[in-house]
Amino acid sequence: LTRTGTTYLHELLGLHPETRSHYAWEQQHPVPTTDDESASAQQFDRERRYKEGRPRFEKGQRIAGDYFQRIHKICYDASEECTVPCSVEAPWNASTLTFMVCSSEKLFDYSLGQTYQLYSRFLQILTWQAPDLASTWMLKCPFHLPYLIELHATFPDSPLIWTHRHPCECIP
């Protein structure tokens, strides 16, 4: 995919106090591990998951290397795109994406209705855990493009922003 500035736009829109994106650390450990529903227990659990997930994230960063970070910076506690939580059964997870690039028509054979339903539950879990944060979710993933009908069916009230650069202007 050509670089269209979606990461920069995502970061910019994420500065607005009424929007919220999920963070990389929340993608690793979205579900509380305690049965205690009190606010203090939930906060303690959230902080513990945050702290315990950092070494795994940093290991992934070392494996990905500086080149990937220059293309798409990922921070542990900053807005992140929805590639990871949607990749449970979507065709763009790391193990299948390289094969799909070779035969991109297969991308259109998938139905992501169930994936988006699971993603909606993921967002509900995060909203429940941090009700004091902004409630307007901002989603970002370039792989949504072939599945806009299913995305809209799951999130019917969500506006879509499409960034575009003409290929002749961005590819030498």
Regions found by a protein language model. Name each.
Residues 1, 138-142:
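Short His-Asn-centered micro-motif
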Residues 1-19:
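Glycine-rich phosphate-binding P-loop
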Residues 4, 146, 169:
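Short alpha-helical
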Residues 12, 122-129, 151-157:
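Generic, well-ordered alpha-helical scaffold segments in large soluble proteins
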Residues 140-141, 150-172:
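Conserved phosphate-donor/acceptor-positioning beta-strand/loop module used by diverse small-molecule
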